[in-house]
Amino acid sequence: MYVIVDIQGQQMKVEQGRRLFVHHIKDVESGASVEFDKVLLVDNNGAIAVGSPLVEGAKVVCEVLTPLVKGDKVLIFHKKRRKGYRKLNGHRQQFTEILVKEVVA
């Protein structure tokens, strides 16, 4: 059984027991329980239920494993040819690691 759920603007295919990295969720602690109720599709062993836009009564219960994980550094390089202009910027995206405990459909 899997569901497609909208987590902070990203649609993810989720199954029970799966670990996910989602955009940083503020004000949560390790071990806290988080619910996501924007379920778009439910596949229960071949029986597919598609919401319009959401599936009624379906939700995903997750546990926060690591509240703040930083991703790899992304480098942004700007250059204007023949002018000697070069600029290097970068950032590290923040994520939250969660574990899917239960899928209620």
From Swiss-Prot:
<dbReference type="GO" id="GO:0019843">
    <property type="term" value="F:rRNA binding"/>
</dbReference>
<comment type="similarity">
    <text>Belongs to the bacterial ribosomal protein bL21 family.</text>
</comment>
<comment type="function">
    <text>This protein binds to 23S rRNA in the presence of protein L20.</text>
</comment>
<dbReference type="GO" id="GO:0006412">
    <property type="term" value="P:translation"/>
</dbReference>
<comment type="subunit">
    <text>Part of the 50S ribosomal subunit. Contacts protein L20.</text>
</comment>
<dbReference type="Pfam" id="PF00829">
    <property type="entry name" value="Ribosomal_L21p"/>
</dbReference>
<dbReference type="GO" id="GO:1990904">
    <property type="term" value="C:ribonucleoprotein complex"/>
</dbReference>
<dbReference type="GO" id="GO:0003735">
    <property type="term" value="F:structural constituent of ribosome"/>
</dbReference>
<dbReference type="InterPro" id="IPR028909">
    <property type="entry name" value="bL21-like"/>
</dbReference>
<dbReference type="GO" id="GO:0005737">
    <property type="term" value="C:cytoplasm"/>
</dbReference>
<keyword id="KW-0689">Ribosomal protein</keyword>
<dbReference type="GO" id="GO:0005840">
    <property type="term" value="C:ribosome"/>
</dbReference>
<protein>
    <recommendedName>
        <fullName>Large ribosomal subunit protein bL21</fullName>
    </recommendedName>
</protein>
<dbReference type="InterPro" id="IPR036164">
    <property type="entry name" value="bL21-like_sf"/>
</dbReference>
<dbReference type="InterPro" id="IPR001787">
    <property type="entry name" value="Ribosomal_bL21"/>
</dbReference>
<keyword id="KW-0694">RNA-binding</keyword>
<keyword id="KW-0687">Ribonucleoprotein</keyword>
<keyword id="KW-0699">rRNA-binding</keyword>
